[in-house]
Amino acid sequence: MSQSTNQIIAIVPAAGIGSRMGAEVPKQYLALNEQTILGHTLDCLLNHPQIAQVIVALNPEDKHFCLLPQAQHKKLLTVTGGNERADSVLAALQQADENSWVLVHDAARPCLSHLDIDKLIASTSTFPQGAILGAPVRDTMKRTGEHGEISNTVCRDRLWHALTPQYFQAKQLKVNLRAALAAGAKVTDEASAMEWAGVMPGIVSGRADNIKVTHPDDLQLASLFLKNLGR
């Protein structure tokens, strides 16, 4: 399933409100190094030479996106997202060429590098079924009981943190994501929908600084990483 002759489209589900940040605006619009988190994310995707289009799924009540300098970019298209990430991704897939390949990337991962995108795109020679960026688990992992006590230590061999982008053939992802949701499957990312359908995606080792801004402390870290990337 080669993508060499088909265009590559980036999908950014950005309809969430990011309540864990405790901010007055959705977290993707928080200021970060003289622009917004989402602005940094979009710059990376829009400026990549192999990405033909970027589709952003927005909350229907969104009043912030139109103020971004990236909002009028010729490669950018917006759609109305849904209540859950999977709903937003499906809405974006409805507008994507079914023959394309899609890179689905979290709005709140502003430190993505072009090098990681290149590695993921190139991975189809090894993983024609699609792949995701990941980072090997480095710390000792513990599972707890219902009261917070440690119940056991989890073996971290071959254990990975799932990152984004996640890279799949558009039609296959749309079919499997829709079927998984209809079956009531728990879909936490695109790879989980593919796994549910019996497709086992590959994992490509990505940079550790490709963090997701989830808590207030993450902003400081993301700022440092972006400066190191020259952004």
Curated annotation (Swiss-Prot):
The record marks R156, K212 as: Positions MEP for the nucleophilic attack. One of its GO terms (biological process) is isopentenyl diphosphate biosynthetic process, methylerythritol 4-phosphate pathway. It is an enzyme of class 2 (transferase). This is 2-C-methyl-D-erythritol 4-phosphate cytidylyltransferase. Catalyzes the formation of 4-diphosphocytidyl-2-C-methyl-D-erythritol from CTP and 2-C-methyl-D-erythritol 4-phosphate (MEP). Pathway: Isoprenoid biosynthesis; isopentenyl diphosphate biosynthesis via DXP pathway; isopentenyl diphosphate from 1-deoxy-D-xylulose 5-phosphate: step 2/6. Its EC number is 2.7.7.60. Pfam families: IspD. The record marks R20, K27 as: Transition state stabilizer. InterPro entries: IspD, IspD/TarI, IspD/TarI_cytidylyltransf_bact, ISPD_synthase_CS, Nucleotide-diphossugar_trans. Keywords: Isoprene biosynthesis, Nucleotidyltransferase, Transferase. CDD domains: CDP-ME_synthetase. Belongs to the IspD/TarI cytidylyltransferase family. IspD subfamily. Gene3D superfamilies: Spore Coat Polysaccharide Biosynthesis Protein SpsA, Chain A. The keyword Nucleotidyltransferase applies.
